[in-house]
Amino acid sequence: MYEVGMREMPERSLLCLKRNVDDQGQWAFGKEFIAILRERPLPKIEGRAGAAFCIYWSHPSADSDGLIEWCKPVPAGEAHTLAEHYPELTLRTEPAHQEAFVALPAGYQAVQWDLACGSLDAWVQEEEQEHEGERLALTPEDLGLRTTYLATGPSDVAIDLAIPFAV
């Protein structure tokens, strides 16, 4: 199991591409989004708050499609102007929130991904018991499981998995 950390995420303007994809199609979908950003780069926002991320609203499998959304934060003051240059992307504002997260190193393996998801699931169960009778204001169903991609070197990318929430 992994240690679950907590962090505050600010309100962000996001340019997004959202689609139902099957298990095999999720990689092609991610490559499509990355190709758009490489072809027409967006202004950089430093740190995790500015990193591209993927939201799994539901998980694709061999048996069914899942709803996935790729997002790139953009400067709020430039968001509407930038959106005009990306007609295939949708502009939306994400509210400020807290996230429970697990960080994985560059070169992570599938087993580490599974352990990280298990750690987040265990955290959610503990929070639900601690706050019995209350509703976590933002749940995975509200904002999905997020995967944030962070460059750690010229060819290395570390990721973290996060669940948004607020008590």
Residue spans for each PLM region:
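A solvent-exposed interaction/effector surface
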Residues: 1-167
